[in-house]
């Protein structure tokens, strides 16, 4: 998708970005020669896999947001009984998903911004956002192991920039490395998780996409 493509192309190798545009959430490796993942929960859920081959950037956009295998886990996590409006992953893990979950549980149609800004005072907002981070952590653990993402994981978008300032983000710092297998725990420990601070990330990504296309043609 264009959203996933934009996320992918904006990664660290993007010439319009500097080191100051990144914030480390969890320490680990950032090796350009290894597979990297970019994820951005916003209107939907963008997810791209990034890899350099022979000094040329390859971006693989995905349709992760339309996956369904996590539905049971997420409906239990968010305590949603009526799942009629929760069909795919991005119905839970996106800004739109946060709105839908809040409306389903309260009957109130607040904006994502209103829900996020109520984190400290609204118990339901806190419940949803805390579990949003739990769900994101669980899924990123699986994705990190699936793709062996030794180059790091990168969050993008205004929603993640805001959540990264909340106490809920500590769950990822404390839990991401945990696995029943010590060997796989060590793999997770070596994977860094980073936040892209730069605004309008998909715009920058799509601008760079045309450059990458020309390199391949």
Annotate each predicted stretch with a short phrase.
Residues 9-12, 45-49, 56:
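Short, well-ordered, mixed-charge alpha-helical segments that flank or form enzyme active sites
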Residues 12-34:
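A gly/proline- and charged-residue-enriched helix-loop-helix capping module
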Residues 36-40, 45-51:
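Short beta-strand scaffold segments in enzyme catalytic cores
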Residues 1, 41-43, 157-159:
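Short, well-ordered beta-to-alpha junction loops that form the rim of enzyme active sites
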Residues 26, 49, 75-217:
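ATP-binding/phosphotransfer module of carbohydrate and carboxylate kinases, centering on a glycine-rich
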Residues 18-20, 54-64:
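A short alpha->loop->secondary-structure connector
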Residues 1-11:
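Single conserved hydrophobic/aromatic residue that forms the stacking wall/gate
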Residues 62-82:
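A short, charged helix-loop
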């Amino acid at each position: 998708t264009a959203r996933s493509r934009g996320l992918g192309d904006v990664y660290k190798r993007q010439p319009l970005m500097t080191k100051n545009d990144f914030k480390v959430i969890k320490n680990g490796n950032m090796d350009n020669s290894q597979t990297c993942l970019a994820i951005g929960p916003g209107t939907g859920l963008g997810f791209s896999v990034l890899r350099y081959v022979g000094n040329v950037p390859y971006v693989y956009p995905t349709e992760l947001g339309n996956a369904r295998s996590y539905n049971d886990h997420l409906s239990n996590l968010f305590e949603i009984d009526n799942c009629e409006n929760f069909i795919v992953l991005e119905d839970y893990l996106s800004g739109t998903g946060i709105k839908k979950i809040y409306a389903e549980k309260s009957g109130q149609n607040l904006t994502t911004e209103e829900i996020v800004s109520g984190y400290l005072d609204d118990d339901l907002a806190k419940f949803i956002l805390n579990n949003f981070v739990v769900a994101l952590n669980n899924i990123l653990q699986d994705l990190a192991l699936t793709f062996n993402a030794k180059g790091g994981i990168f969050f993008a978008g205004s929603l993640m920039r805001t959540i990264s300032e909340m106490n809920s983000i500590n769950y990822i710092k404390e839990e991401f490395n945990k696995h029943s297998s010590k060997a796989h725990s060590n793999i997770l420990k070596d994977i860094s998780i980073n936040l892209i601070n730069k605004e309008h990330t998909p715009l920058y990504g799509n601008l760079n996409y045309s450059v990458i296309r020309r390199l391949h043609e």
